[in-house]
Curated annotation (Swiss-Prot):
NCBIfam families in the cross-refs: PRK05309.1, uS11_bact
UniProt-listed HAMAP family: Ribosomal_uS11 (MF_01310)
The protein, known as: Small ribosomal subunit protein uS11
PROSITE patterns the UniProt entry points to: RIBOSOMAL_S11
Subunit structure: Part of the 30S ribosomal subunit. Interacts with proteins S7 and S18. Binds to IF-3.
Keywords tagged on the record: Ribonucleoprotein, Ribosomal protein, RNA-binding, rRNA-binding
Gene Ontology annotations of biological process type: translation
Stored PANTHER family: 40S RIBOSOMAL PROTEIN S14/30S RIBOSOMAL PROTEIN S11 (PTHR11759)
Amino acid sequence: MPPKSRAGAVKKVRRKEKKNVAHGQAHIKSTFNNTIVSITDPTGAVISWASAGHVGFKGSRKSTPFAAQMAAENAARKAAEHGMKKVDVFVKGPGSGRETAIRSLQAAGLEVGTIQDVTPQPHNGCRPPKRRRV
């Protein structure tokens, strides 16, 4: 049997490089169950992201405006570490966390340029789910 190499060989780990991007886009997807905030550079490459579930909320608490606020703050903080200063906001979906997410991006220190609603509208596409009976 060949002799064993020394225990705990050193592995080279590639570290995430800090992108220095001053202007970008914030994509807020707010559904009835969750809110996802992705901050990208102008080409669309994701720099940071956070969701209500990723921040620590579970179940029906993910769909609250407060959870959306925490997710947006978290994503904005990570983007600011990469040098992000100004964002254009694209909001998608009918959820309750739309406005609070935009406000918390501003509160976290990002300057909001334009705000666009990019919610997809069907031209009579798929049949919607049946009505809820509570």
